[in-house]
Amino acid sequence: MKWTNKQYVDLMTYNHPERPMFSELFGPIIGLSDEWRSQGATEDMIAMKAFAFDYVPYYNLGNLDTIHRPKEIVLEDTATRYVGIDHFGRRVRMDKRTSTIPLPETFPVETMDDWLKIKHMFEYDPCRISEDEIAKAKALQDQGVLIKSEILGGFDILRELMGEENCCIAFYEDPELIVDILKTISETNVKVLSQISKKLTIDQLSVHEDMAGKTGPMIGPNLVSEFIVPYYLQAWELVKDAGTKLFCQDSDGNMNPVIDAFIEGGINVFYPCEPAGNMDIVALRKKYGHKIAFRGGIDKHVIRRTKEEIKQELLYKMQPCMMEGGIVFGLDHRIPNGTSLENYIYYIRTAREILGLPPFEECEPSWGRMAF
């Protein structure tokens, strides 16, 4: 079912929603489509449309990413392998059989001088937003499309520029570099979001971090509060004052130790809430109540197991305390390889039954990616 921006915002702010959403946030991982075709899947199933998922269409307003990027250089590109130099000047490599994101082998920033060479890519430029783009977004918003703007992650961009190890060390040994990077990006955020907020209220501010593994985040709550929270608040307080209600963070892994710090920074929606990283949406709901909302939270690994295990996962995650709003139920990541089509269909049917939704076969085909 296609939702409107108002329905989605009402759901995520606990404003008397009709029901929770049931979605597929990401879709199948590489290779699963071929597995399912061999098991009799239709092309509508491969495209996720057959399962009548809930979704809200969205539009990203304003360019808060890097600009004036140098041309990427391809060093090797075969059927199974890609090697190149990306827009940051990093040497990157990707195995096309298992991945869609090239991984960096080198990083451009070790010192302040390194940063100054690429700083212009993060600074404000009028090309980042235009009156025509704002007008287009306003027209879409009036039609029910969710309008979002996305700032760079306060940790994520540092990791992209410096690598995880050097980034974490720099918080202690070169805080001036960290501060200058975040200050530069923040100034750009404020200028662009100020222009937007004079003409319309965005529905959601988004940020991507991916800053944690199974055992915890790569920096703790003290560093988040000292460096990341002020960066967040400069953007969030601006759009919040203009009427924006949602500030959504995307981060894998175990974020439990830093949730309170990020709430301090304005975050009120977390996803994908990875159970393998000890992110339990039921426990989090009981701890935080209506203070935060979630997308995801259903263990993607369970759907490769027995049907009874699938049912128990759904009964636990979809218990009555989770039905008050503030939740988009869905797998915590892409559907993993080895998930049988039979199991996936059982998962869909069981979830829809628990939620009181009609069988997907009786509904209009629908799906929209919900990773925003």
Task: Walk through the language-model features, giving the residues of each.
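Active-site loop segments of alpha/beta catalytic cores
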Residues: 1-39, 83-85, 94-95, 112-372
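N-acyltransferase acceptor-side catalytic subdomain
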Residues: 5, 22, 46-48, 57, ...
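Segments that shape or occlude catalytic/ligand-binding pockets
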Residues: 32-70
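A structural signal for short, hydrophobic beta-strand segments that form beta-sheets
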Residues: 70-76, 97-99
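Acidic surface patches and DE-rich sequence motifs
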Residues: 77, 86
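Extended Gly/Ser/Thr-rich low-complexity repeat segments
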Residues: 93-106
